[in-house]
């Protein structure tokens, strides 16, 4: 899981030729804490994707631009184009995330 140090590093992943999963989260979010332990398993099941953890509080303007108002949320891009999103305020399970990633 990549944790970008700044907006420029984060932006560089949007244009990637590979599928990139942006995982929007926050340290204070209990539903995000629930999913952290299984993220390595999810990443292992999707080796063709790059995973980028985005702290919504650090990148609030980006979250607003991308209409990320509930966390945890996932947005998948490739070559600057959004391929899919799993964005809502509900707690997400490993199975739900894997099912979503299988569709993009």
Model regions and ranges:
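Thiol-based oxidoreductase modules, predominantly thioredoxin-like and allied folds used
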Residues: 3-5, 24, 39, 43, ...
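N-terminal leader/targeting and pre-domain segments
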Residues: 1-20, 96-104
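Chalcogenol-based redox active-site neighborhoods
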Residues: 34, 65-66, 91-95
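Non-catalytic, surface beta->alpha helical segment in thiol-disulfide oxidoreductase systems
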Residues: 76-104
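Local sequence-structure signature of Cys/Sec-based thiol-disulfide redox active-site neighborhoods
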Residues: 11-41
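Short hydrophobic/charged patches on amphipathic alpha-helices used for structural packing
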Residues: 10-11, 60-63
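Short alpha-helical
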Residues: 30, 58, 92
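Structural micro-motif
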Residues: 66-75
């Amino acid at each position: 899981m990549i944790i970008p140090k700044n907006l420029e590093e984060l932006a560089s992943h949007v244009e990637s030729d590979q599928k990139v999963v942006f995982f929007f989260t926050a340290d204070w979010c209990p539903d995000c804490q629930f999913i952290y332990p299984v993220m390595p398993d999810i990443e292992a099941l999707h080796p063709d994707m790059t995973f980028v953890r985005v702290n919504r509080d650090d990148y609030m303007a980006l979250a607003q631009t991308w209409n990320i108002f509930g966390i945890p949320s996932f947005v998948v891009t490739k070559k600057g184009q959004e391929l899919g999103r799993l964005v809502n305020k509900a707690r997400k399970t490993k199975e739900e995330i894997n099912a979503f990633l299988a569709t993009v």
